[in-house]
């Protein structure tokens, strides 16, 4: 009896470990990768962003970024000794297979794990944009059809949400059964999960219609790091470690002050401008530059160093418009080191008003009583210091708005100015630009209002 109980307990223990333990000892786990959508066609996802026109295949298409992630994951899994199959090798309509065909091919491949790689979209107006990752498996969230599919999803989650070079609107990776997430579909669920006999999940790695993320997703190396993180999720699921002896570094270079404009919804550091054309050097302890990277011109600020030997490094970031910055980092094997770098702009002259309105002199026609005051500066300005330095005599209350990345200040009176009155407007020399330098002297002008 005791022997029977002991065997039963051992069987329960092995069952609890499930597929994870069973495959931890296999020589070559097999991963099947499906980069979602394809072909730049009607079932693909195109988000037009400057400077790319609607339909431009060089701009953002979900199929492009899904394939970048897929090929990165395959490359890294191969290095780790996995067997890998992918559902398509090119991005054409011809190999944009039906979902049922993908499932059949996966089932026939003998794969242990199936990853369907995607990014998400709100499908709503820009004011509703969000950014967080989600993972789906077949069944109900608390009752998966195959429990190991939920385990697979949960094993991936910390590596995707751990990306510190995006900005998440929510701090959690959402794990869902597809029947719960799409209740109106009943038990149909997602097509690539329906009938899939492997340990299968579908990942929505971020929201591609959150515009700062859209710009990041057209950077192949940014997508490469997501592929790397998928490989870590696979290792965690199979109980594998130590197969990759190098690490990865990814960073995001932004201006430390200048606001990003033209996008309605932004979170956290995404509200500041990314720096295009920053030269980034990875320098080892001997002072040798081991890798370099130049941030692209697609307004994402991303740089990536791949297959970096473990150790301590200095990362030097330079751009002619910014002060050079050096940051020390530590790289670990089969791990990602993230860094967000804020660059201080070189402002080598004092602030000055280069134009203003209304421009008025004695004998000119009077100014309308609701005319805003507009100041155009030679530098991006310290908003608080500049607003505090503004005086209007006689005193007028109003609101201040900034445009042109803080190069332009607009004062609009709350009520109309007094009629037939001469006003004196002064910006005191305590006015500062973003580098903290004050104006050499006060700036003053006058205007006179109309009779009515």
What name fits each language-model region?
Residues 29-34, 41-43, 116-126, 136-137, ...:
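Active-site-adjacent mobile loop/cap segments within catalytic or ligand-binding domains
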Residues 269, 273-277, 281-302, 307, ...:
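Short, acidic Ser/Thr/Gly-rich low-complexity loop/linker segments typical of extracellular
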Residues 301, 310-321:
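A short, solvent-exposed beta-strand micro-motif common in secreted/extracellular proteins
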Residues 325-349:
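Extracellular beta-sheet/turn segments enriched in Thr/Pro/Gly and aliphatic residues
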């Amino acid at each position: 009896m005791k022997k029977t109980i002991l065997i039963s307990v051992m069987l329960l223990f092995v069952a609890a470990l499930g597929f994870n333990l069973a495959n931890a000892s296999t020589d070559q786990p097999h991963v099947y990768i499906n980069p979602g959508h394809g072909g730049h066609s009607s079932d693909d996802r195109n988000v037009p962003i400057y400077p790319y026109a609607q339909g431009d295949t060089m701009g953002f298409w979900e199929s492009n970024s899904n394939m970048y992630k897929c090929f990165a994951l395959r490359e890294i899994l191969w290095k780790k000794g996995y067997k890998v199959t992918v559902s398509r090798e090119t991005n054409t309509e011809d190999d944009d297979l039906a979902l049922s065909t993908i499932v059949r091919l996966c089932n026939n491949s003998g794969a242990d794990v199936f990853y369907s790689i995607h990014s998400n979209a709100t499908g709503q107006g820009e004011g509703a944009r969000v950014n967080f990752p989600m993972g789906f498996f077949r069944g109900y969230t608390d009752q998966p059809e195959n429990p190991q599919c939920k385990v697979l999803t949960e094993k991936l989650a910390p590596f995707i949400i751990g990306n510190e070079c995006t900005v998440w609107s929510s701090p959690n990776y959402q794990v869902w059964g597809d029947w719960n997430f799409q209740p109106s579909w009943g038990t149909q669920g997602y097509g690539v999960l329906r009938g899939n006999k492997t340990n299968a999940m579908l990942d929505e790695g971020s929201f591609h219609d959150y515009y700062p993320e859209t710009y990041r997703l057209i950077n192949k190396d940014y997508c490469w790091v997501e592929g790397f993180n998928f490989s870590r999720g696979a290792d965690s699921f199979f109980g594998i470690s130590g197969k990759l002896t190098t690490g990865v570094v990814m960073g995001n270079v932004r201006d430390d002050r200048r606001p990003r404009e033209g996008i309605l919804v932004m979170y956290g550091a995404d509200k500041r401008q990314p720096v295009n054309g920053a030269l980034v050097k990875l320098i080892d302890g001997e002072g040798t530059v081991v890798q370099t990277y130049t941030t692209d011109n697609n307004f994402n600020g991303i740089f990536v160093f791949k297959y970096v030997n473990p150790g301590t490094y200095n990362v030097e970031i330079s751009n002619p418009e910014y002060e050079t910055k050096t940051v020390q980092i530590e790289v670990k094997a089969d791990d990602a080191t993230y860094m967000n770098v804020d660059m201080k702009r070189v402002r080598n002259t004092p602030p000055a008003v280069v134009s203003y309105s209304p421009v008025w002199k004695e004998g000119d026609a009077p100014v309308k009583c609701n005319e805003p005051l507009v100041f155009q500066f030679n530098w991006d300005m310290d908003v608080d210091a500049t607003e505090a330095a503004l005086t209007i005599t006689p005193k007028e209350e109003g609101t201040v708005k900034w445009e042109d990345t803080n190069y332009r200040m607009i004062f609009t009176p709350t009520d109309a100015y007094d009629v037939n009155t001469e006003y004196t407007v002064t910006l005191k020399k305590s006015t500062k630009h973003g580098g903290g330098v004050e104006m050499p002297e006060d700036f003053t002008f006058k205007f006179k209002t109309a009779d009515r």
